[in-house]
Amino acid sequence: MASTLPARGLAAVMLAALAAGCTTIAQRPEPAPAPRFSALDVERYGAVAGEPFHVPAVSLEDLRPRNLRQLVEYGTREAPGTIVVDPKHRFLYLVQEGGKALRYGVGVGREGLAWSGSANVATKRAWPNWTPTPDMIRREPGKYAKWAGGMSGGADNPLGARALYLFKDGRDTLYRIHGTNEPETIGHAVSSGCIRMMNQDVIDLYRRVSAGAKVVVLPG
């Protein structure tokens, strides 16, 4: 009898070890990655209703999050309501109270680097007409010569849904802040045009800015 006790004890220990080996420890699931774009971003860049021409939703996956409209810290001596264009970093700022600004991503064309300084918004136009410059026609006649007489406003117009026209001392600077039907170009240098914004953004800026507003264009 005494000789069997160690064997029984050993068997019990082995059974306990086997049972422990079959026990699974519950693993906490990995948290889902945060979405690249918020619900607010999706809403802001959705299709725009109430316009005379179709403004489609922007495919956010084609954009970098930094180029979406957002409130940022912005130290400047310019008064609230001033537009500051930074062609080098491809941002446009609308100065707000409290050291902040609304920042919009922009695309910068060749004409957008041709002038810097301060001016004012002389005219605001919804769905503006567009005429290519003589330089644009010379560079790409096959693309622009047919529009030498101008193109009416519409979904295919390169100026997009809105345009702000900058004048200095009563004279046209030929500098424009406008929409685009090519939102994928935002954040990039482009061959032609001045400062282009997504149509959703230029519509937002248009609502916030009055004629006469100061605009500062930094050197590119």
Residues covered by each model-derived region:
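N-terminal pre-domains immediately preceding structured catalytic cores
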Residues: 2-5, 9-220
